[in-house]
Amino acid sequence: MTDTVSSSPLSGSFDFDLDADDITSVLRKHLEGYAPSLDRQQVGHIIEVGDGIARISGLPNTSVNELLEFEGGTLGLALNLDEESIGAVVLGEMGHIEEGQAVTATGRILSVPVGDGLLGRVVNPLGQALDGKGDVTSSETRRLEVQAPGVVDRQPVKEPLQTGIKSIDAMTPVGRGQRELVIGDRKTGKTAVCVDAIINQKGQGVKCIYVAIGQKGSTVAEVVATLEEAGAMEYTVVVTSPASDPAPFKYLAPYSGAAMGQHWMDNGEHALIVYDDLSKQAEAYRQLSLLLRRPPGREAYPGDVFYLHSRLLERSAKLGDHLGGGSLTALPVIETKEGDVSAYIPTNVISITDGQIYLQTDLFRSGVRPAVDVGISVSRVGGSAQTKAMKAVAGTLKLDLAQFRELEAFASFGSELDAVSKAQLDRGYKLTELLKQGLHSPMPMEEQVVSLYAGTKGFLDDLEVSDVRRFEQELLEEFRSRYSDLLGEIKSSGKLPDKDKLEEAIKAFTKRFQDSTKAKAASDGKPAAKDDKAAAKDEKPAAEKSAG
């Protein structure tokens, strides 16, 4: 059917034909590929906002840790799921968020990028780059919070993770998959111990994560510079939430680092994670919980603050061989006040971990660094995480030093001591000097074994305390140049070499060292150092003379 419309040109009108069939076919053609779709969204509204917290109504199907989107694109994290509303923390700028605004449920659980693309980078708890080197390149993401490996999925900790610190590797050894707490007052060297442990993993096939929680920005920059200088950033990722960050970021930072570490563990690799420090995470969680109006408990912490740390630290494990045999080792840090390890958060974390390294303020101030207090420090894994060589030389070292500390405290009262006690004190001072170590200078396991063998077998007994560090330095130089085969044997086998060879080498060096020390003293016009027996003989007539 065709309709024709006509008009005169003079009147400005025109003729055209309308073909209904053509119009229908064109419309059909355009509608053929059309599929109706509905964009369905869950939308709620803000009923209260302030202090980084938003209370939202109208999102009944929201999950815990689900991401919410505010107007303007700012993200929030659902933490409280109440009957009538949701308590969410705002992950970003709050200036434009107001009551009455719409909030959209994204359906996504908070995740972070993982994988080797993170190595050498400094990121925030959401995995966003902070180092100005462009976006993080990662093809995989992982949820911040996942279930820790079960009992069947684990195997006992039996493989050593060398920290490079003599006093730790000898007396409180750390194994792959272990959780070893580093605890002490502020300014006692906790961060230095952990950074040294990271530096010592170079060439060991261990990837590292350093999580800085509530630290000063300058402190984090210093740690990153130290790691770069030592070439450790090649296998390390730094996750930082500085003191200037809002509380939600400090709360999330450790879980973000754990997710990155678990990725490597699940792929059969080995990882080491440092949480520096969990005291500040607990304080941030307390702040969030009080703002979310959760009931406060002891010291105003919420009732689940133990679970806050236990679910984090339980994610560190040594997986069974059927799952690839990967491991995630944790070094959590806790700051104490006035040395009080019996406070709430310290006792919580001590009960969760597999031992603790306690750094004492008095030792630190007296020049014993690292300031490890052997009396209270312990590794619940113990000798299982040591090589046979280290176990052989460090067998009684911890007991000897603990007894020395007690005897030293007793001697400070000015009591008369017998010859055995004096000898024990003298050896204790020399062993303490031997265990001192410079900042950021971790020592290979084979060199530690040689050094400790010399100390525990009495080779230091005839030296002055002031000569011990020089003796150790020159002894190790001698072994590197003349006895590298012995060092290589210790490194490859993990066992002590032929004791006669080792003892003969140390004995020969000790004699040369004593001769050179005496010659130097004679040339300087000083009396040569006497051994203990000669000194005791000289003391006796002097005492008789003074009595007369």
Language model features: what each stretch is:
Residues 171, 248-285:
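Phosphate-binding/switch loop-helix module in NTP-utilizing enzymes
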Residues 4-9, 13, 96, 263, ...:
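Conserved catalytic/coupling modules of large nucleotide/cofactor-utilizing molecular machines
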Residues 205-208, 234-237, 268-272, 325-330:
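Loop/turn-to-beta-strand initiation segments
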Residues 203-206, 217-263, 290-302, 322:
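Nucleotide-state-sensitive switch-loop elements of NTP-binding domains
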Residues 101-103, 110, 114-117, 130-179, ...:
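P-loop NTPase nucleotide-binding/switch module
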Residues 176-226, 277:
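Walker A/P-loop NTP-binding active-site region of P-loop NTPases
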Residues 3-30, 36-39, 45-161, 497:
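Acidic-enriched and Gly/Ser
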